[in-house]
Amino acid sequence: MRIESDLKLDYSDVLLRPKRSTLGSRKDVSVERTYTFRNSKQSYTGVPIMAANMDGVATFEMADELAGLGLFTCLVKTYSVKELVNFFDDSVDSVRNARREHVAYSMGITEADFNKFLSVMEQTDGGIKYVCVDVANGYTKFFAEYIESLRNQFRDIVIIAGNVVTGDQTQELILKGADIVKVGIGPGSVCTTRIQTGVGYPQLSAVIECADAAHGLGGHIIADGG
């Protein structure tokens, strides 16, 4: 057993120090950003705030509302192939493009999950730009190998993978093919992982450490409740 004794911080442990600004109003602030991703070479322009793939949150309706504001959504996994095809292959060009640029398809790592994804990709003529591979434990060897296999089969899809909380596994997933790594185990207000398993990491320290690891490789992270 190894006990880490150095200080780890959660969001509740810190405050943002105010500084002088040349802006006259908060309305003058633009939070839109452009990112180019390491492995897929794709780019994203929008507000870097994401609705997580939670039941009752990341629905089609929410995705359309957020896309209209330049925000991002990772859809829930529960939609059927037919529903997903209808969503991503809308007949209106502007709607279809907005969904392609601001919505991710979410999936697990079972064979059934992969076959479902293939079916949606085929029926939308490759109309999915982002895929979020979401598991409870991002530290398994199988998960890293799955990301590598997915990258080898889909070179230009933006892969979001998680969740992890340490720099070493962040690096591993990026080197295997992930463009964006989801960071966080247990900090969400309704997440029970820490309570039930005793597994987790103070979120601010996790974000700082994982961001440092990712940026050193030209990768990206997303802070997530997990």
State each model region's role.
Residues 1-220:
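Active-site entrance/lid segments in N-terminal catalytic domains of soluble metabolic enzymes
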Residues 223-226:
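Glycine-rich anion/phosphate-binding loop at the beta-strand->alpha-helix junction
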